């Protein structure tokens, strides 16, 4: 039995009782990485020397009264979250040798909590993708079946947890990039409310949509991690000054009287029968525990995909303009003048998907098309947000599938961008509205790949979605199943 089969609270007790050491946890992580990483390819960079030194330092503090629950816990960090002195590439050749000189706020908070960073995790380049096949280095595989994708863009973050390489990880979610891979890999992934977690130190893709969040084996562990990284940060102008409650206090298993909304759009066209049936089965479980549910409508959801790709690509076009070979990142050697430097550096440094989205965003922002595309997309975004607010006036949570289908095979969709984009139709509306949502395991498809249940909450009401997710998790055995890698 792996140490990582235990929860954070169980491991904390073992540490305090001196049944295990922090070094044991770190060595468990690196041993598992040595055993499976050649197949999974979840990591881009390991930090073995520093991790082992930190573990030795913390071993001397075991049993101290001020040790928090995350003391000594091994974590992986998505490679678009900067780490001081530890290579941060965004899985792009553009930043292949970038060593940041500061830590992201979330990394600072986790260091203060005495977690240990095992390494940096693979992803779709600059967080643009749904399968991890867009990594500029190599594709991560799904631990449940290596022929299948782990999802994206936080595919490395989800795969590392599912494979037992780390206890938990950080990802980022712009249009579903935590929840979709969590669903595909059979783990728990939360996108917090926009502004709940600082984005300082997150390499920007789409600044009005990006949000850092936790990926874990259980809902309880997820709540521990969010508790540690949440809160106001003066370094992030979009960080919200909203009190962070005690997320653990609500994990009682009680959902009696809970009002659940189920959008008909989330069970309709484009959603596979397996995903639909898994949600209905989950609703029956929650109904048996005293919750009630009704079908509702989010009428503007059908426009979410187009709205998202116009807005996110426009923001990416602006954010990624800084990578030009002048200040940092790679620099093309094939240069005769300044224009050559810009053009050749960007052509050689960016992958196809990143260039595709930059071109789309540049077009949407160009004069003559701005009102027709970008401005109209912003207006539709407001309508989508209003739809959520209207539903939440009468219901506590919204529930539906996380993804239309289970994971697909490697290479199956990578050459068809529109089909690939459609994998995010159920997660994108949440980002556009800025509300929180969690994906928890809820069954398996005919291909024996995991399915995820998405629970969406009101702004800054992560506590309620944790309560519902935990109650469902404890009433079922989906979370106890592990990839047999």
Swiss-Prot record:
SUPFAM superfamilies noted in UniProt: Amidase signature (AS) enzymes
Kindly list the GO molecular function terms attached to this UniProt entry.
ATP binding; glutaminyl-tRNA synthase (glutamine-hydrolyzing) activity
Q: Give the reactions, separated by semicolons, that this protein catalyses.
A: L-glutamyl-tRNA(Gln) + L-glutamine + ATP + H2O = L-glutaminyl-tRNA(Gln) + L-glutamate + ADP + phosphate + H(+)
The EC code for this enzyme is 6.3.5.7
Q: Which residues form the active site?
A: 78 (charge relay system), 153 (charge relay system), 177 (acyl-ester intermediate)
Gene Ontology, cellular component aspect: glutamyl-tRNA(Gln) amidotransferase complex
Cite the InterPro entries for this sequence: Amidase (IPR000120), Amidase_CS (IPR020556), Amidase_dom (IPR023631), AS_sf (IPR036928), GatA (IPR004412)
Q: Which Pfam families match?
A: Amidase
Alphabetically sorted, this entry's keywords are: ATP-binding, Ligase, Nucleotide-binding, Protein biosynthesis
The UniProt function text for this chain reads: Allows the formation of correctly charged Gln-tRNA(Gln) through the transamidation of misacylated Glu-tRNA(Gln) in organisms which lack glutaminyl-tRNA synthetase. The reaction takes place in the presence of glutamine and ATP through an activated gamma-phospho-Glu-tRNA(Gln).
Q: How does it assemble?
A: Heterotrimer of A, B and C subunits.
User: What PANTHER family would the database entry show?
Assistant: GLUTAMYL-TRNA(GLN) AMIDOTRANSFERASE SUBUNIT A (PTHR11895:SF151), TRANSAMIDASE (PTHR11895)
**HAMAP family in the record:** GatA (MF_00120)
Family according to the record: Belongs to the amidase family. GatA subfamily.
Q: What is this protein called?
A: Glutamyl-tRNA(Gln) amidotransferase subunit A
What species is this protein from? Bacillus cereus (strain AH187)
> What lineage, starting at the top, does this entry show?
Bacteria, Bacillati, Bacillota, Bacilli, Bacillales
| Gene designation | gatA
């Amino acid at each position: 039995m792996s140490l990582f089969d235990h929860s954070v609270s169980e491991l904390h007790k073992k540490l305090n009782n001196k049944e295990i050491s922090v070094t044991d946890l770190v060595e468990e992580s690196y041993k598992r990485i040595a055993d499976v990483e050649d197949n999974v390819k979840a990591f881009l960079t390991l930090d073995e020397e520093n991790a082992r030194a930190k573990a030795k330092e913390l071993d001397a503090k075991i049993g101290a009264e001020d040790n928090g629950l995350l003391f000594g816990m091994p974590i992986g960090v998505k490679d678009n979250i900067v780490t001081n002195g530890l290579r941060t590439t965004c899985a792009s050749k553009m930043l292949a040798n970038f060593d940041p000189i500061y830590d992201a706020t979330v990394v600072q908070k986790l260091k203060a909590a005495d977690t240990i960073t095992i390494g940096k995790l693979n992803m779709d380049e600059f967080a643009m993708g749904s399968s991890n096949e867009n990594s500029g280095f190599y594709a991560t595989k799904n631990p449940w079946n290596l022929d299948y994708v782990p999802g994206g863009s936080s595919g490395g973050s989800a795969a590392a947890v599912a494979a037992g390489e780390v206890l938990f990880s950080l990802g980022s979610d712009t249009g579903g990039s935590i929840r979709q891979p969590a669903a595909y890999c059979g783990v728990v992934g939360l996108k917090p409310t926009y502004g709940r977690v600082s984005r300082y130190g997150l390499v920007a893709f789409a600044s009005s949509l990006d949000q850092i969040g936790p990926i874990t084996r259980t809902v309880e562990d997820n709540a521990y991690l969010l508790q540690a990284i949440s809160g106001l940060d003066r370094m992030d102008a979009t960080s919200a000054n909203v009190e962070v409650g005690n997320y653990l206090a609500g994990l009682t298993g009680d959902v009696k009287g809970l009002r659940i909304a189920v959008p008909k759009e989330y069970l309709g066209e484009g959603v596979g029968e397996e995903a639909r049936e898994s949600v209905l089965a989950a609703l029956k479980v929650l109904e048996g525990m005293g919750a009630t549910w009704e079908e509702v409508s989010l009428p503007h959801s059908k426009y979410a995909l187009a709205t998202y790709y116009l807005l996110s690509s426009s923001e990416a076009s602006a954010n990624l303009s800084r990578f030009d070979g002048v200040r940092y990142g790679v620099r093309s050697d094939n240069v005769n003048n300044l224009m050559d430097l810009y053009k050749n550096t960007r052509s050689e440094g960016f992958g196809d998907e990143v260039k595709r989205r930059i071109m789309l965003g540049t077009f949407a922002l160009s004069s003559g098309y701005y009102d027709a595309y970008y401005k109209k997309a912003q207006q539709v975004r407001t309508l989508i947000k209003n739809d959520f607010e209207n539903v939440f006036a009468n219901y506590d949570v919204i529930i539906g599938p996380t993804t239309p289908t289970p994971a697909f095979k490697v290479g199956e969709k990578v050459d068809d961008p529109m089909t690939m984009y459609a994998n995010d139709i159920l997660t994108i509306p949440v980002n556009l509205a800025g509300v929180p949502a969690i994906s928890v395991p809820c069954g398996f498809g005919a291909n024996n790949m995991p399915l995820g249940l998405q629970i969406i909450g009101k702004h800054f009401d992560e506590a309620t979605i944790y309560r519902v997710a935990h109650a469902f998790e404890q009433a079922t055995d989906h979370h106890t199943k592990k990839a047999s890698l």
